[in-house]
Amino acid sequence: MLKNHGYYRVVRDGKMSSIVCCDGGVFRFYPPTSANPEWTIENLLETPASDATLIDFDGDGKDELLVLSPFHGDTVLIYREKDGKYELDYEYPKKIEFLHAIWSGEIQGKPVVMIGHRKGNRDLLKFCWENGQYHAELIDYDCGPANAYGFHKDGKDYVISTNREINEIAMYEFD
């Protein structure tokens, strides 16, 4: 795996796995268990990528795969699983320089992916599913997120973003 970068932990149906991205594509690693003492590795995509996450945007019971491509690239891609393979379902129409931050989870009861980029407009964006299609919402601009993480506390949702390009750690609150 050359130029590997992205790591995203996934827990589904009690099974832990990890998404790892590199020039050679997007891979899913399953660690050894008592039932299977060997590592299992799936090649999900051959598309060069720096980061990816799995989330069920549309509530159909199958995770979509959101990918930042290529390495620290400018393209947000969303793949849908069909017949055991991931096929491109959506490409964000704008090019986004130096994609870097990624987090997936729930905000306001909806599955979302937060994306940040460190050049150009340096935005923090929220991707979700609305009215039968993918939707991107600008959360903050000119901030240059390097990492993002969401959590729920006292009935509210929050996202923490390390806005490296402006020397800031920001907290965004969603009611």
Question: What is the meaning of each model-derived region?
Answer:
Residues M1-D175:
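Beta-propeller-forming repeat regions
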